[in-house]
Amino acid sequence: MAITIQMKLNEQLYLKDPQDTRLGRKIIQHSILLIDEIGFEAFTFKKLADQIGSTEASVYRYFTNKHLLLVYLLCWYWEWMKFSIDYNTMNIEDARKKLRIAISSIVDTTRRNTSIEFVDEDVLHRIVVAEATKAYHTKEVDKENRDGFFMTYKVLSKKISDIITEIDPNYPYPRALASTLLEMANNHIYFALHLPALTDITVEGGDLSQVEKLLEDFAFGLLNIELK
């Protein structure tokens, strides 16, 4: 049975929260599918409207432009990842175990959760891998950062960095390591699929176990902790 999970996202990203209406959820569902199919550059609100049997104007009632829609989708994904880490580390005392769970969640969040009917996290993850940098490698990034567009990503990264500090309070680069783990997961999946000479891992049949192993080796190696 499908359930409704309401993600609290920055209100400046949208004109009307798409999670609140059937049409809005349909916009989210099909924008994910369409961006995955044709890419963000080719994606337009007109093409989306045609796909959902609505009008371009109806999409503009929710989002000012497709850039904000992309940021919204990424924030939804990052918030879902944070929820996954929170849930899976609940009542865990061993910080090393928490970091392994967090790393697993970074990878596992990419897998489809059939309980959320309007978001296919597996497809959304492909968008994160291929398109995420287009959300914040822009001329407007400083203003958008001041407006809190990327707070969800920063909170997620801080959660991981706090676990790293819990393991080793003297480690000097917890924030850098946390953000690197998040980016590394996406980068090496992309490399494995499209630029294999840039990575040592392979991704076949949706098996991301090598990605998880890479993140563990990298993180625990820098923290001088032997994996068992």
Where do the protein language model's features map onto the residues?
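Alpha-helical structural segments
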Residues: 29-33, 68-90, 101-105
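Amphipathic alpha-helical packing segments from all-alpha helical-bundle domains
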Residues: 97, 124-166
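Short, Lys/Arg-enriched N-terminal segment that forms or immediately precedes the first helix
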Residues: 8-19
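C-terminal peripheral helix-coil segments that are non-catalytic and often amphipathic
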Residues: 1-10, 154, 158-169, 179-228
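A short secondary-structure junction motif
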Residues: 80, 84, 113, 131, ...
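Short, amphipathic alpha-helix enriched in basic
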Residues: 14, 22-44
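Helix-turn-helix
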Residues: 41-68
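Hydrophobic alpha-helical connector segments
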Residues: 72, 88-122, 178-181
